[in-house]
Amino acid sequence: MNTKILKALEFDKVKKQFTHFLQSEQGQMELNDLLPMTNQEKIERSFAEIADVAQIFQEYASFGFGHSQDISESLRRLELGADLNTQELLAVKRILQMSAELKDFYDNLENVDLQILDCLFEKIETFPDLQGSLQAINDGGFIEDFASPELTKIRHHIHQNEQQIRQILQEMLKKQGDLLAENLIASRSGRSVLPVKNTYRHRIAGVIHDISASGNTVYIEPRAVVNLNEEMTQARADERHEMTRILHDLSDRLRSQTDIIGNNAWLLGHIDFVRGKYLYMRENQASLPSLTTDQTIRLLSVRHPLLSNPIANDLHFEHDTTAILITGPNTGGKTIMLKTLGITQLMAQSGLPILADEGSKVAVFKDIFADIGDEQSIEQSLSTFSSHMTHIVEILQKANKDSLVLFDELGAGTDPQEGAALAMSILEHLRLSDIKTMITTHYPELKAYGIETEFIENASMEFDMVTLSPTYHFMQGVPGRSNAFEIARRLGLSEIIVAEAENLTNTDSDVNKIIERLENQTIESRRRLDNIREVEQENLKFNRAVKKLYNEFSHAQDKELRKAKLKAQEIVDKALAESDFILKNLQDKAQLKPHEIIEAKGKLKKLVPEIELSKNKVLKKAKKKRAAKVGDDIIVSSYGQRGTLTKRFKDGRWEAQVGLIKMTLQESEFDLVKSDKAQASQKRQAHLVKRTSQKAPSARLDLRGKRYEEAMQELDEFIDQALLNNMAQVDIIHGIGTGVIRDGVTKYLRRNKQVKEFGYAPQNAGGSGATIVTFK
């Protein structure tokens, strides 16, 4: 895009409005280099980035990362083999810190769905090791003592020397204070000295380093501290040497990472730039327009960014409209409207938010040309008309159907009749070339051209006849009219003179009356539109408030859910720890009897939180139908085992005989079984009983085709069930295969103290593919 348009529309001034929203020098550099784009995808990407930042600010109001310097020159020096000074290292350190902070911020983002910035955040790399090394440089650019053991040692020595020198000189101040010009310790050439009166210079032995301008004071280094000062000088030299070595070491560590650090710096600057664009949009009630492919432009309540308190106007430049012709007297705001269209297009094509309401649309032009204002060339001694015409000729040679052309006062600066004719001819050429054009003119001849010519639309600026001043409201579809007669009347010109003038221009008067009616209709339409927009704004505010409340509620709900999950996890962790303890105790026992298994499983059951069933009306009603009594058959819910009630205690608990074991149970821990249909009832109720089998316990376990871990788990459960059901003997089919499961079964049975004996089945019953187990 040609650079003349940027100067004509003061694009650089617009860019400066974004400066105070930026925090990084890299972001400022990106703003300085910003130019309008002609690639629609790139423009839409810029808008999507701003929309991403808007999402972030909606959830996190404090999104920012502080000031940072441009480190590109420092990185270039590193690549050339140079070492950085402390200030340069401090700038790099800040970039690394900001990278880590921004990466951490991104990793903790919630409730946002980033479309573009996701990939930028993910490209940021962190360098914890380098950050740790650069802690040797503090925020003041000073190398810390802990930067190296040698530096620690040197500075400790310097500190001790300083204390000794100060102590000696303090003693001399006390004892020989009357010989001194001032009672203080001075410094000359890096050495501690005393300001001695010239008349007593021979009373203090030492080295003279300086004499005051008046000659009354001599600065003497007492002999008692000469050696210490020599040591101090050497220590300072050692310190400088060690600091140089440290800077070289730190620079070497950074040298291999310059590309990545440089990319990080660019990413930080770019994100800062996008953040700045969003902040500008928020502060100025700007918006992100949509892009059209047919050169349609619809600007709603558009304002010029460089004006204070600008008047908002609507501008509709439809795809089938070739030109908009703004007519009317000067000082009405025609040029401002022309510039507003131009600068809005430049901002949008630069990926910047525009000062217009949401729902606005802009086109994407390959080039924008403008001839605005008085551009007379003094050096070329050209007249105003010649200057304008030279520029217009250049524009007509370069413009095409992908261009936008803006002409201010086309044809001005020459004879009005000839100027109007030239303006119409130029406009006709642009129309036939299908080039989008907006022009301003005060020539009345062009109004008729705009009315009669297809694809040309008239427009004007509103004038308040009460205050006799322009309102700067844009009236599209209404040509401008002269207000000379009405103004003359209001200013007191004789009615006879005004009436005579109106009679002399009777035709024009009729046209002006038609235009006046159009103006009134346009003003009324705008008033109604303003009312509609007020309602829309109220609805928008309401929708935003509802969305904010929903987000707050959603966040609170998520917080409570996370809290509940953490609490549940604590309960589960505690239960697992206790279950491990119980199982460990079982494994440690030499003998494991059936009642011990039941007791252990009872303890494990208690780890599961109990559900309050006392208020369950269905269960209450069901239990009332039949009360438990001694002799009833039951099924123990915890184990799915059948037993018989033998005794009821006063506290409501029951004693039950389950196999060979007596158990004490609550009523909620068992279900009644009708004695005459116990087996059938057990099957019917099995689906209601926790861990209850759907069929009678089997005396045979088939492990063929199982994985080793799965087989061992099933074997353990099978042996438990067999012991609980008082089985004397069971069969385990493991097959021959690789022998892994068979060996596992053998090892398990050898460890189990309840197994009396075991061995392979007879040849006709499976042989070495099955094992028969007999319990004690």
UniProtKB/Swiss-Prot annotation:
GO BP terms in the entry: mismatch repair; negative regulation of DNA recombination; rescue of stalled ribosome
Binding residues for ATP: 328-335
Keyword Hydrolase: yes
InterPro entries membership: DNA_mismatch_repair_MutS_C (IPR000432), DNA_mismatch_repair_MutS_core (IPR007696), DNA_mismatch_repair_MutS_sf (IPR036187), MSSS (IPR046893), MutS (IPR045076), MutS2 (IPR005747), P-loop_NTPase (IPR027417), Smr_dom (IPR002625)
A GO MF term: ribosomal large subunit binding
Alphabetized Gene3D superfamilies for the sequence: 3.30.1370.110, P-loop containing nucleotide triphosphate hydrolases (3.40.50.300)
UniProt entry tagged with the keyword Nuclease: yes
Record Pfam families: MSSS, MutS_V, Smr
S-S pairs: none
Domain named Smr: residues: 701-776
EC number, as in UniProt: 3.1.-.-, 3.6.4.-
Coiled-coil region(s): none
Keywords linked to the UniProt accession: ATP-binding, DNA-binding, Endonuclease, Hydrolase, Nuclease, Nucleotide-binding, RNA-binding, rRNA-binding
Family statement drawn from the similarity comment of this UniProt entry: Belongs to the DNA mismatch repair MutS family. MutS2 subfamily.
Record's function text: Endonuclease that is involved in the suppression of homologous recombination and thus may have a key role in the control of bacterial genetic diversity. Acts as a ribosome collision sensor, splitting the ribosome into its 2 subunits. Detects stalled/collided 70S ribosomes which it binds and splits by an ATP-hydrolysis driven conformational change. Acts upstream of the ribosome quality control system (RQC), a ribosome-associated complex that mediates the extraction of incompletely synthesized nascent chains from stalled ribosomes and their subsequent degradation. Probably generates substrates for RQC.
Subunit annotation: Homodimer. Binds to stalled ribosomes, contacting rRNA.
Protein name: Endonuclease MutS2
Organism, as annotated: Streptococcus mutans serotype c (strain ATCC 700610 / UA159)
GN (gene name): mutS2
